[in-house]
Amino acid sequence: MKSEKKSQEDESNILAVVRVRGLVNLRHDIKKTFEYLNLHTKNWCIVVEDTPTLKGMVLKVKDYVTWGEISKDTLDEMIKMRGELYQGRLKDSKSHMEYNKFVIIDGKKYNRFFRLSPPKKGYGRKGIKFTFVQGGALGYRGEKINDLLRRMI
């Protein structure tokens, strides 16, 4: 019983965050949060763990992003189709600091973000100015993030 519960928790610990709205007329603190999340442009996606710190950052930019729990199949498909190999520095010139701007999957180093195309058939009935509950695209969408990501790959 406990092992089943733990495996379900492990799968739901990974969130996919997709930036839906653009760069114009953003407050300074919102811009900084997007920089910390590495979501610089519209239709970029990051995959993060569901920690309280990252959850707070996502809730701060909730009016500009959509997020939900990503399945293993969708994550594998995103890595296969849109994963970019990391080509930056691993250490600085004096070996004092190591960079962790990459994720190691199957022995390969990938960037932490995915550049996606706009979704086929759009975001929703009401577009990008309303929440997902109201028929738009913003906010938490749970497992339905997988459908959106498959349309964006």
Regions inferred by a protein language model and the residue ranges of each:
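Core subunits and conserved enzymes of cellular information-processing
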Residues: 1-153
